[in-house]
């Protein structure tokens, strides 16, 4: 009996020791695991599975993706290959292509003819018939989503592509034709655009193509600087300034929708379609 009792005491002691070790480890290890920066990739994989597989219909968007930019992993996806109306998000493709045609510091003359193509009731940046830097016009397209700026950019770039073309509309048509070729060559194969402002009910794109073009543009610091501000002041070639308020209310500290972790990108709406590309940063990750 004495030997059996000692043996039981020994086993109980070993059990108690390991139990104590487990409890102590749990006290320190579990809070460490719960920190967002630890086991991030494993947690992301779990969240991606849970939210992507079990809740695709819980979002009212026609199509969407939530992407980890560090590795291009999708947390959430819904009809990502389905073509949708881009509205003003079309300007992202226009800017990406225009930036390959002319330098940011190019001086662009804005003509009355180009500005007058802006459709009544559409968003404008108050572009005047004067000289602008190209990056001024990019900001005017991105911040207040100025359709007038988009026509000026398309007119200018169309003139570079075809210097002999005489009319504004023809230069814009040349730019748009060349843009659509560029889209196919860059792999934006589900995107087709007919109007540089995005004010077009026949244009099509997908959230995957939008993800690709935004990733391309985010390589440029000038783009990040523009899209991250709730208001933007441009200095024009003549030294004057022009300011715009961002249509993205997530950036506005006075808005109920303000979120300090949102650092871009762009809104777009047309008819009953409301589009949004959001760049969200937390713990140094986008």
Write out the residue ranges for each language-model feature.
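N-terminal Lys/Arg-rich, disordered targeting/topogenic segments
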Residues: 1-14
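Domain-terminus/edge residues, biased toward the C-terminal soluble/receptor-binding domains
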Residues: 188-189, 201-209, 214-286
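Active-site-adjacent loops and short helices of periplasmic peptidoglycan-processing enzymes
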Residues: 32-208, 217-221
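Hydrophobic membrane-insertion alpha-helices, especially the h-region
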Residues: 14-29
């Amino acid at each position: 009996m004495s030997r059996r009792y000692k043996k039981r005491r020994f086993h109980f002691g070993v059990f108690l020791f390991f139990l104590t070790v487990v409890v102590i480890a749990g006290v320190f290890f579990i809070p460490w695991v719960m920190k967002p920066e630890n086991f991030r990739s494993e947690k992301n994989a779990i969240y991606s599975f849970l939210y992507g597989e079990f809740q695709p219909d819980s979002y009212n968007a026609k199509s969407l993706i939530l992407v980890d930019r560090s590795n291009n992993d999708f947390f959430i996806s819904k009809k990502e290959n389905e073509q949708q109306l881009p509205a003003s998000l079309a300007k992202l493709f226009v800017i990406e292509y225009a930036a390959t045609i002319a330098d940011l510091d190019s001086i662009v003359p804005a003509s009355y003819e180009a500005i007058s193509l802006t459709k009544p009731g559409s968003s404008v940046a108050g572009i005047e018939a004067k000289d602008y830097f190209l990056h001024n016009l990019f900001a005017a397209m991105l911040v207040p989503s100025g359709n007038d700026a988009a026509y000026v950019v398309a007119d200018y770039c169309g003139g570079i592509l075809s210097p002999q073309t005489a009319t504004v509309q023809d230069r814009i048509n040349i730019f748009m034709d060349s843009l659509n070729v560029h889209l196919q060559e860059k792999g934006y194969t589900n995107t087709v655009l007919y109007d540089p402002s995005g004010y077009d009910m026949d244009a099509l794109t997908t959230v995957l193509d939008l993800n690709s073009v935004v990733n391309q543009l985010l390589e440029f610091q000038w783009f990040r600087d523009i899209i991250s501000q709730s208001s933007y002041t441009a200095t024009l070639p003549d030294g004057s300034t022009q300011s715009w308020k961002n249509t993205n209310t997530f950036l506005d500290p006075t808005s109920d929708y303000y979120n300090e972790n949102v650092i871009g990108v762009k809104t777009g709406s047309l008819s009953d379609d409301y589009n949004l590309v959001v760049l969200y940063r937390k713990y140094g990750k986008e």
